[in-house]
């Protein structure tokens, strides 16, 4: 059925609903299969109308269509069966078993037998799994929750759960428009025509009473243009008997998929590549939030898109991690925590902010560009301005004569746009005069000149970063009506796109279906789309307002929005239907005459924000009505600039008095409070050591390989690192003489290593268990932080859960409250498939993001366990080879990287039970795997002391290197090499018995190392704290050392006597460390005797000592000690 015919069905459905033909409405829904009315379905389930439930479902899916459908029908029929048993209607139960449930026996015979055995019980609740079954009403409600999840995940229901957003009585409106048009064609139109029928075209009667000719032979109608010549009615094209010419890009483009891809723009990848790359945006399956139970006139978004999954593996195990939650767009009862009502910071920039952008990884770093050409870098957590640079041309001799003349005539320059690169190692500034300047960022206040490009004649109106052909590029547009693409390392120009007839105002690069493209808007309101070739524009559409318009995608890359203001001050915020190049939704609530160009931003795939009428206005993406307004305690300009940080916890807003207000939601407030505490600790430490405030040198090494410049562009030499004094003054180190050596130190204030030697100096808790436990091989906190999971060397899993009570209101893990060793009522243990000698097997596991499942192995098959029931869901991959390490892909939990004992890494797709790739590069077993979702790489480590970096796009090996291991040190015990990514996703931790090191991923070079002294105890394990500020390391002598992660200097040492009982054997030591996912100063240890301990600092201390002072007063570059050397603070152990 054509798209227009489908839309006609929706119009009829709306009409029937308005006319109260309720049964007919649902019959048409079922027969057409276009719209699944979740509200109706819910009502029928709650009322137990099982025949109607299955009849209605039958219009959309059948039992054997896919595994989702099978599970839906199974749950319904199982509930019907249980209700018959509950009523002691055995004959009805047998009938249901034979007619309805037997079809599932071929798929799971054991389950069918178990269901059949319920007939033998007097009360089916005697079955352990059904012991908590309540009354019929509550059981139906619980089942309904599961059914809704299955329906939302089922691809057959995609695009069928959301009713289009139609104005009321849309069909009547279209008929009236048609009648009006017909009336205009009458030869003798009457002032008040009498419409008696819709069965034939309207025509006013002849004055002499003669009959009007029929439409078929009416010469007037034959001579008028076809409907295609008339303006479209509403947002849809008119009904046409013949197909209209397809635009060059087939609408906008075609077939974007439903799964998000970790590309520059957060765009989407799919299951295949379209045959026509120029057709990438047509018929999108947009994974937006949706309301499954709304009435007809109000629904308007495409539905959440999810992958299929095998029966028995419900929830999130094999669903994409970035799947969106279902929300209810018609309900405005959002938690107040969602909104940025709190003014958390007020920053004084000194000139009017024109553009702002938060760092993509460090959530509190804010770039600001102003109307006088200044650029500033703020840490809004500490309220400190790290950098202030005034505009100047780096090399005037390399600039065009036009620019030189322009600057001589009028030296004033404004920043039009400032923006970070996707990984935060570069940022670009577009100025109102010809120039684009690119800086590299090395952490803290260290920014360096990278590229200066004389990009456009006139102003450079916008700048963006993109990754065409896996190469970082810079995209600019300007007053000269062109868009240009530059290579980000050398500044070489790659493309110039011409075709606009007015200055180009903005660019919006995006990625879909392996196709990179760019949207551009010009001051005449034209929107064009470009591929990275020389074939010209693929799209030519008009933006609402026909003037200054910017475009942006939602964070997941699935929905396209634009915001523009006309010359008359009329503002338009709209969502686009990419398949048709038409406006899908227009948001209401703007002032009729905006006093400036309205700016906007999106956050969390859920909200839109725009600055208008001295306010910040907020919309739900799925509702055109204004959701709320925020005045930020006043002081805002008429059209304030707005910018969210990546996580959506902070919102930067420009103020009237050359300042910026930082608004925070509840999560943002907590983030800033955490940083305030850390800032206070750091400043106290700084005053005690008489040194300047520390910056994070780990992040300083985050710059990508982008330091060289090519001919034709100006690439500035690295400037001396800047420091920021406490008064915010930004100066070069050249201008500041070090005073530390000249000032006498107060010895009582010199920094001192924190040593914990007895139990009274910290909080420690041994987790009790009632079974004889073997060595703890693996240990992890659940992602929620409320439990600890351990895997012992006897292949048994242990799960401790903390209670929520008066002593522990959060319910999270703590050393102050004892948890319970949790077991299901059945007494079943999660036990891995084992070999003949499990004690010598390699044990490994990986936990799903929602803590519902654990994938685990102990030398035998890999097992998938349900964490709620401890039930084994499936087993796969029998040895040999045996799995030695497991890691879920960060974008798709269907994909698992499995390290093997034969030195290979297998990329396994759970959903289709297939090995997609086999990576070869190591010579011994794999001992560590870690993904970076920023760099799109997998880092592996092996027993061969080799580290490899693999691209997750094509699974090619990018780099490899051997660890630097002192040749003079024999290996005392065989220990793994482990890897773990830093929070910035750019660096990773390497742990070996001889050393701890931090590597920069793209260059695969160590930026910091801490080698173990000769004849000292080897390292057994180490791990970052949840905020990557600390590293917890355990040693063979049971000592635990806590390092400052930015400097790899020892900050605290915990001796065994402080947490182990006195009578314990000297052979007992920690073999694994786990860090709490949200409490940075809490960690757990798994010991050789099977003990698990949780450690925290005293409540009076709150932390494990103070950070050590920076070496030699330096705060920037990370140094690497020579091979085998010891750091200056190396303790005697």
Curated annotation (Swiss-Prot):
Pfam families with a match to the protein in the record: LisH_TPL (PF17814), TPR1-like_2nd (PF21889), WD40 (PF00400), zf_topless (PF21359)
- GO terms classed as biological process: regulation of DNA-templated transcription
Keywords in alphabetical order: Repeat, WD repeat
Q: Which residues form a coiled coil?
A: none
Region Disordered: what ranges? 287-307, 1099-1133
Instruction: Please report the stretch or stretches of sequence annotated as the CTLH domain.
Output: 34-92
Q: Where is the composition biased (Polar residues)?
A: 1112-1133
Q: Which SUPFAM superfamilies match?
A: Quinoprotein alcohol dehydrogenase-like, WD40 repeat-like
Family matches, as InterPro entries: CTLH_C, LisH, Quinoprotein_ADH-like_sf, Topless_fam, Topless_Znf, TPL_SMU1_LisH-like, TPR1-like_2nd, WD40/YVTN_repeat-like_dom_sf
What are the WD repeat spans here?
A: 348-388, 410-449, 455-496, 499-540, 543-586, 590-629, 634-673, 771-810, 837-875, 878-918, 921-960, 1014-1053
Q: Which SMART domains match?
A: CTLH, LisH, WD40
Tissue expression, as annotated, is: Expressed in panicles, stems, leaves, spikelets and seed endosperm.
Q: Where is the LisH domain?
A: 4-36
What role does it play?
A: Probable downstream regulator of strigolactones signaling. Functions in a complex with MODD and HDAC1 to down-regulate the histone acetylation level at BZIP46 target genes. BZIP46 is a positive regulator of abscisic acid (ABA) signaling and drought stress tolerance.
**Record note on quaternary structure:** Tetramer. Interacts with D53. Interacts with MODD and HDAC1. Interacts with WOX1. Interacts with MOF1.
The domain section of the record reads: The N-terminal TOPLESS domain (TPD) (1-209) binds directly to a 12-amino acid LxLxL EAR motif peptide.
Can you name this protein? Protein TPR3
Q: What organism is listed for this UniProt entry? A: Oryza sativa subsp. japonica (Rice)
**What lineage is on file?**
Eukaryota, Viridiplantae, Streptophyta, Embryophyta, Tracheophyta
- Gene responsible for this protein: TPR3
């Amino acid at each position: 059925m054509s798209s227009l015919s489908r839309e006609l069905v929706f119009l009829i459905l709306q009409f029937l609903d308005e006319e109260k033909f309720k049964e007919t409405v649902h019959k048409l829904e079922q027969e057409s299969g276009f719209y699944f009315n979740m509200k109706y379905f819910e009502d029928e389930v709650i009322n137990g109308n099982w025949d109607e439930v299955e009849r209605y479902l039958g219009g959309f899916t059948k039992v054997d269509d896919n595994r989702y459908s099978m599970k839906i029908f199974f749950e319904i029929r199982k509930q019907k069966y249980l209700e018959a048993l509950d009523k002691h209607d055995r004959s009805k139960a047998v009938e249901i078993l034979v007619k309805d449930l037997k079809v599932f026996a071929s798929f799971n015979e054991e389950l069918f037998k178990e269901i059949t055995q319920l007939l033998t019980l007097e009360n089916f609740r005697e079955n352990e799994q059904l012991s908590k079954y309540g009354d019929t009403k509550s059981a139906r409600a619980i089942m309904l929750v599961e059914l809704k999840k299955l329906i939302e995940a089922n691809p057959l229901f995609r695009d069928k759960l959301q009713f289009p957003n139609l104005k009321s009585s849309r069909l009547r409106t279209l008929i009236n428009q048609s009648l009006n048009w017909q009336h205009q064609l009458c030869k003798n139109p009457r002032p008040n025509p009498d419409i008696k029928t819709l069965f034939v075209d309207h025509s006013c009667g002849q004055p002499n009473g003669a009959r009007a000719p029929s439409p078929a032979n009416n010469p007037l109608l034959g001579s008028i243009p076809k409907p295609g010549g008339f303006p479209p009615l509403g947002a849809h094209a008119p009904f046409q008997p013949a197909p209209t010419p397809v635009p060059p890009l087939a609408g906008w483009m075609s077939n974007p998929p439903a799964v998000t891809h970790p590309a520059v723009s957060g765009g989407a990848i799919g299951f295949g590549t379209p045959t026509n790359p120029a057709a990438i945006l047509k018929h999108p399956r947009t994974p937006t939030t949706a309301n499954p139970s709304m009435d007809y006139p109000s629904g308007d978004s495409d539905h959440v898109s999810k992958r299929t999954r095998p029966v028995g593996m419900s929830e999130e195990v094999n669903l994409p991690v970035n799947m969106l939650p279902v929300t209810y767009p018609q309900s405005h009862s959002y938690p107040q925590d969602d909104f940025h009502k709190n003014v958390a910071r007020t920053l004084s920039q000194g000139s009017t902010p024109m553009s702002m952008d938060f760092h993509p990884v460090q959530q509190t770093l804010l770039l600001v560009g102003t109307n006088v050409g200044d650029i500033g870098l703020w840490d809004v957590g500490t309220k400190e301005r790290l950098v202030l640079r005034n505009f100047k041309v780096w090399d005037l001799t390399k600039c065009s004569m036009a620019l030189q003349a322009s600057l001589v005539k009028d030296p004033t320059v404004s920043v039009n746009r400032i923006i970070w690169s996707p990984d935060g190692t570069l940022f670009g500034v577009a100025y109102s005069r010809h120039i684009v300047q690119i800086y590299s960022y090395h952490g803290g206040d260290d920014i360096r000149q990278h590229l200066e490009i004389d990009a456009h004649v006139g102003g450079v109106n916008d700048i963006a970063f993109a990754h065409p052909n896996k190469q970082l590029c810079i995209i600019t547009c300007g007053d000269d009506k062109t868009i240009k693409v530059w290579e980000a390392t050398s500044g070489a120009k790659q493309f110039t796109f011409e075709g606009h007839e007015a200055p180009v105002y903005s660019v919006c690069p995006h990625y879909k279906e392996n196709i990179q493209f760019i949207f551009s808007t010009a001051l005449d309101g034209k929107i064009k789309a470009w591929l990275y070739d020389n074939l010209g524009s693929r799209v030519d559409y008009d933006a609402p307002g026909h003037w200054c318009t910017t475009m942006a995608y939602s964070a997941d890359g699935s929905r396209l929005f634009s915001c523009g203001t006309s010359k008359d001050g009329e503002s338009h915020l709209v969502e686009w239907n990419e398949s048709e190049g038409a406006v899908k939704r227009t948001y209401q609530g703007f002032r009729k005459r905006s006093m400036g160009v309205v700016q906007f931003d999106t956050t969390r795939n859920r909200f839109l924000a725009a600055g208008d009428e001295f306010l910040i206005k907020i919309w739900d993406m799925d509702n055109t009505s204004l959701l709320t307004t925020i005045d930020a305690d006043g002081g805002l300009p008429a059209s304030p600039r707005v910018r969210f940080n990546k996580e959506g916890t902070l919102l930067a807003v420009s103020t009237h008095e050359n300042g910026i207000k930082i608004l925070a939601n509840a999560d943002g407030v907590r983030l800033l409070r955490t940083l305030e505490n850390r800032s206070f600790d750091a400043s106290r430490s700084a005053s005690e050591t008489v040194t300047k405030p520390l910056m994070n040198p780990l992040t300083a090494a985050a710059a990508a390989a982008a330091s060289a410049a090519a001919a034709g562009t100006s690439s500035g030499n690295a400037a001396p690192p800047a420091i920021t004094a406490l008064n915010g003054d930004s100066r070069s180190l050249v201008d500041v003489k070090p005073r530390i050596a000249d000032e006498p130190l107060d010895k009582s204030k010199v920094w001192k290593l924190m040593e914990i030697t007895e139990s009274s100096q910290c909080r420690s808790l041994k987790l009790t268990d009632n079974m004889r436990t073997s060595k703890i091989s693996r240990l992890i906190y659940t992602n929620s932080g409320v439990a600890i999971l351990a895997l012992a060397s006897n292949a048994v899993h242990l799960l401790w859960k903390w209670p929520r009570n008066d002593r522990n209101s959060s319910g999270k893990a703590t050393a102050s409250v004892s948890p319970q060793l949790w077991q299901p009522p059945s007494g079943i243990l999660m036990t891995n498939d084992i070999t003949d000698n499990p004690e010598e097997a390699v044990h490994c596991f990986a936990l799903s993001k929602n803590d519902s499942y654990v994938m685990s192995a102990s030398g035998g098959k890999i097992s998938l366990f349900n964490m709620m029931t401890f039930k084994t869901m499936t087993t796969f991959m029998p040895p040999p080879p045996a799995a030695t390490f497991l890691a879920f892909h960060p974008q798709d939990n269907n994909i698992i990287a499995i390290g093997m004992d034969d030195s290979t890494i297998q990329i396994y797709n759970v959903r289709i039970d297939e090995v997609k790739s086999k990576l070869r590069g190591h010579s011994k077993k794999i001992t560590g795997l870690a993904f970076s979702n920023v760099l799109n790489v997998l880092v592996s480590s092996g027993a061969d002391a080799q580290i490899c970096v693999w691209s997750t796009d094509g699974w090619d090996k990018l780099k490899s290197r051997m660890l630097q291991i002192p040749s003079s040190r024999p290996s005392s015990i065989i220990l793994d090499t482990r890897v773990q990514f830093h929070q910035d996703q750019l660096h990773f931790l390497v742990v070996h018995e001889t050393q701890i090191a931090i590597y920069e991923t793209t260059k695969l070079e160590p930026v910091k190392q801490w080698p173990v002294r000769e004849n000292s105890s080897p390292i057994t394990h180490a791990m970052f704290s949840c905020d990557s500020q600390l590293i917890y390391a355990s040693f063979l002598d049971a000592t635990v050392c806590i390092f400052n992660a930015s400097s790899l200097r020892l900050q605290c040492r915990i001796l065994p006597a402080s947490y182990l009982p006195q009578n314990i054997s000297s052979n007992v030591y920690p073999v694994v460390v786990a860090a709490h996912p949200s409490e940075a100063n809490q960690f757990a240890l798994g010991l050789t005797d099977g003990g698990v301990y949780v450690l925290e600092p005293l409540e009076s201390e709150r932390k494990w000592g103070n950070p050590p002072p920076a070496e030699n007063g330096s705060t920037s570059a990370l140094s690497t000690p020579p091979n085998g050397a010891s750091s200056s603070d190396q303790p005697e152990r």
